[in-house]
Every structure is written in structure tokens, then in C-alpha cells.
Amino acid sequence: MILAEGLHAVRALHERFPRVPIVADLKTMDGGYLEVELMARAGASWCVVMGVAHPATIAACVAAGRAYGVGIMGDVLAAPDKPATARLLQDLGAEVIIVHTGYDERRQVIGASPWDDLASVVAAVDIPVQAVGGLTLADLPKLPAAGAPLVVVGAPLVIDNDSFRASESDDERLGRVIREVVRAVKAQR
């Protein structure tokens, strides 16, 4: 049921914003081909597979991505050896690596962040890297210089840090952060 409802959301976003890339952050662990196929048919541009999934699942996601013109992002969340997992994802055909420090992990390991693994993962692969989870607005403009040019601006702006409730939005702050990130990305070219 959750997958089916997600399809409705992806389809609606694609219809409303046909030129905007849509990432289906499924965190796929099994059923890789089917999940990517379904999301691709709904209008997703990218799908996310977990690096701790079986290599057959990762390969199935990549095969479906190629068949349907969808990019595959590999997430190293919970991998015991993040650089090795990132290399495996790259070798199996993922096009982007996500260095992700999860919400629960950050609650248990105070201070944990993608910065802990970012340099070693960037050094391990030849494909773009994105950092997610526990980043602050001040971190975002620094990511491109650290080898993570794909910046996600989301949770720090719209979700309260200690709960999944909406935070107060500040359009001026959002505009400033986006301008800083764009400058940082352009400086890396």
C-alpha cells in the first residue's frame, strides 16, 4: 500500500512539474527491478537502492534504470565499510553515491554526520557523491569543495530537528542558503 501511494505522489509531482527531476527515495532492499520500473512509469527520474541490499537487488535496480531511463543512486546508510560499499555500488552501475547518516543513528551517536565518512567515500569512487542527514544550513555551501556537489536542501528548512513536525519556514533564509550553495557549486567547476 505504501508503494502504491508513493506512485500516486510521484505521478502527481511529475504531471505538475514535468521538467523537475524527481527522486524516488525508496531505499530499496529487495524487489529492485519492480520498484524501479513502477517508479519510472510514474515519472521518477532517479531511484535509491541501499548499498547493504544484496548485490542482485542492486544489479536489478541498475538494469531497470537502464531499461526505463532512470538514474540509480546508491545509499551507504548502515554499511559497515562505507567506502567499500560505495565502490561496490559504483561497480554494479549506480550513478550517484549517497553518504547518509540516519535519523536514529544521529540520536544514538551524538554528533554523527555524513562528514565522518565523506572524504573516504569521495576518494573511493569516480561518480558524484551527495551527503544527507544531520547537516546544518551552514554545512551546505561547504559540501561541493568536500567532493559532494549534489546538495539536498530540505529537512533543515522544513522539519524541526527533534521531531518530524514542520518547522517555521523562513523564505529569506532559504534564498540566502540556496544562493550560497549555487556559488559554492559554481566555484568547483
Predicted regions and their residues:
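Catalytic beta/alpha-barrel core
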Residues: 1-3, 20-29, 45-56, 71-79, ...
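Alpha-helix-loop-beta-strand connector modules within alpha/beta enzyme cores
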Residues: 3-27, 61-78, 112-134, 170-189
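Surface-exposed loop/turn and secondary-structure junction residues enriched for glycine/proline
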Residues: 4-5, 31, 138, 160
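Catalytic cores of alpha/beta
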Residues: 31-42, 80-92, 124, 135-153
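Glycine-rich phosphate-binding active-site loops on the catalytic face of alpha/beta enzymes
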Residues: 44-56, 97-108, 146-177
